[in-house]
Every structure is written in C-alpha cells, then in structure tokens.
Design a protein with these regions (language model features):
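Thiol-based oxidoreductase modules, predominantly thioredoxin-like and allied folds used
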Residues: 106-118, 130-139
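Conserved hydrophobic/aromatic "anchor" residues
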Residues: 57, 80-84, 124, 132, ...
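N-terminal targeting signals for export/organelle localization
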Residues: 1-56, 165, 176-179
C-alpha cells in the first residue's frame, strides 16, 4: 500500500526550496515568456568566481547616480537581480542597510538588473528602499561576462579589483556573513 502525499504539501515544499535557494539564473525567466531559453550565461559553472579579476563595465544608473562601475580602490558589491525574483525583494533592504552603514568607509554597491525590459526597475528599487545605484543590463551584455547562476547573485570586489566573495541566491540572515566579509576588506 502506497501513501499519497497531498499535492498542496508538494507545492508548499517546492515554494520553500525555491525561496531559500534563490531564483534560477537570468535564463530561467523571461518577463513575457517564462519558458524562454534566453541566456545570461548562468548555470554553466563558468561564471565569475572567487579570486577572479572582476570584469569591468560601465552602466547608466536609473535612479540618478550617474555612471555605474567598479570603483578602483573601493570595496564594491556587484549585485545581479531582477524584479521578478522573490528573494531579491528581501535582499534589497539588507543591501541598503549595509550601504548606509559602510558607505562612509568606502563601500560601493552596483545593482545590475537582468530584466528583459526596463519597465518597473526604478519602481522596484524605490519600493524596496534602494538608494544605491541601480541600472539595467539592456541585452544582458554584463551578465554574459559575469554569468550569474542565481538571482540574486552578489559579488564582493576588493580594492584590488579581485572577487573576494560570491553569494548566490539569498537566505535570511546572510547579511551577517556579508557584513563580516566587508569589515575585513574595508
């Protein structure tokens, strides 16, 4: 005799696992077509890793911060995110707290949206309290270089331009670990 597991329990379990790990890579979602195979290069294990030289880029800020880039001689968090990503809604306020706390010590945050369209990006940033620079990776050219595997994916870049830490996805309480890493670098 087999025991049947209620469908609602399976759905709840799937939602919990997805929320705790993070959204799939940028290729896992297309704003108009969730089954799209558009790729940002994530998921192949060949993305930017700890110890790598951070790929350079310049991006226009959508919230009035001018040009966004990895500032030489500063500790920078490069955060890949999307408006459709549930864990990103939790991580943005935590990034803002870190930004306020450590900006005077030299912390920069560069938030790179991998959304297919720019509609909603600025509203998302406002709704979730982001005062740090937020930009749109039109055509996913930056994501193609970095190859984030999950949303959000955060890369902590040291003053020397090397990737010191990589965080894929977001889980509650992760900001304590990130803060410890930042303190050691600032």
């Amino acid at each position: 005799m087999r025991t049947r597991i209620p469908a609602s329990l399976l759905v709840i379990s799937l939602v919990a696992v997805t929320a705790s790990v993070g959204c799939g890579g940028a290729e896992a979602h297309d704003a108009k077509d969730p089954t799209s195979s558009k790729s940002s290069g994530g998921g192949d294990g060949k993305g930017v890793k700890q110890g790598d030289k951070a790929p350079t880029f310049t991006l226009d800020s959508m919230n009035g911060a001018g040009k966004m880039t990895i500032a030489p001689g500063k500790v920078t968090i490069v955060d890949f995110w999307a408006t459709w990503c549930e864990p990103c809604k939790k991580s943005f306020p935590k990034l803002q707290e870190l930004y306020v706390k450590y900006k005077a010590s030299g912390l920069e945050i560069v938030a790179v949206s991998v959304d297919d369209e720019k509609n909603g990006i600025t509203d998302f940033a406002k709704t979730h309290g982001a005062k740090f620079p937020v930009g749109w990776d039109d055509g996913k050219k930056i994501a193609d270089k970095w190859k984030p595997e999950n949303m959000p994916s955060s890369y902590i870049i040291g003053k020397d331009g090397l990737v010191k830490h990589v965080h894929r996805g977001y889980h509650d309480g992760e900001e304590a670990e990130v803060e410890k890493e930042l303190k050691a670098l600032l």
